[in-house]
């Protein structure tokens, strides 16, 4: 990576064929999951006319994802990781086929949608954990920042494209097309993933899966560095739940339906800019301090967001949050991979991802509770400034993370 450039270097896709295969598979997978994400709530709403039933499907899938992340972490540290990834993807695709066949029935089964949602949520997260644990072996630990930034861009781009395609398919062909193409896309991802090298876990003594998972918890709690990173990640995810207040704040700002879209687009746009301008992050001598400060800045942006007199200024605050949270997330990802022993990578990645999932749910619940007692403006500000106070305390308490220093990676000729 060129020291003189702030821009992200994409050369990793050229120099590392295995990472290129993962990049391609991940992009196709994100688009496929996006088609599914549009179709499931629409189908349930059409069948039941109940937002509660739609919410139940999201909750069940989220619960299955949490369990899948826990189980996937243990499996990724115990079995050959490539096999775990392929098994999870293939099994997930079978669930999508089930959703497609159910949608083609004269009277689709609501119970089948719920059960297949549990199936897909579990196996999708199983593969995610194994892939995260395998990444250092695919790109080398010195390239993790670059790999994380490219991955973030992939996720953001796919998240923008897939709902648009999903909406067009719903308008022209119905939900069965969404499910069918999601299944096809998932099986297509197996082709590039088959080219991956063998990814065996490091040798370690066999133990009961629950005991193995508890060992991961103990490592997380015993390590001030890794535990602090995970804690910051959870708080940052809680802050992103501010999106539940967008409709109410839009009324406060008297925004049109078209303008509300800017609120939802602001954070992904800011995050994409953060990933694109992450060229120098890997060369930071004090990544822990930078992570803490960028996290504090993101909380401040949320606190100021609801106080803005004009919606356009609120959008700027959200974009700033997206940028700062991207910086913090990239540093979290890189430090977590480099500071975790190889034998623990599956479990720690599973726990880190799981706390992100639960952080979002907790943040949404807290904001919903605040919204019942306060105005939307007060709720947004209270959440942002409350997290800012907690962040300042963590800045003082997490001494090892704050003082952590690293030797910046050497610049190679291919990076210049």
UniProtKB/Swiss-Prot annotation:
Membrane topology per record: Multi-pass membrane protein
Subcellular localization(s) per the UniProt record: Cell inner membrane
PROSITE patterns: MFS (PS50850)
Ranges that cross the membrane: 22-42, 56-76, 84-104, 110-130, 157-177, 179-199, 219-239, 257-277, 288-307, 314-336, 357-377, 379-399
Cystine bridges: none
Aminoacyl-tRNA synthetase as UniProt keyword: no
Domain of life: Bacteria
Coiled coil: none
GO CC, one annotated term: plasma membrane
Keyword Cell membrane belongs to the record: yes
Cited NCBIfam families: PRK10489.1 (NF007792)
Family the UniProt entry places it in: Belongs to the major facilitator superfamily. EntS (TC 2.A.1.38) family.
Function description: Component of an export pathway for enterobactin.
Protein name in the entry: Enterobactin exporter EntS
Organism (species): Escherichia coli O139:H28 (strain E24377A / ETEC)
Recorded name of the encoding gene: entS
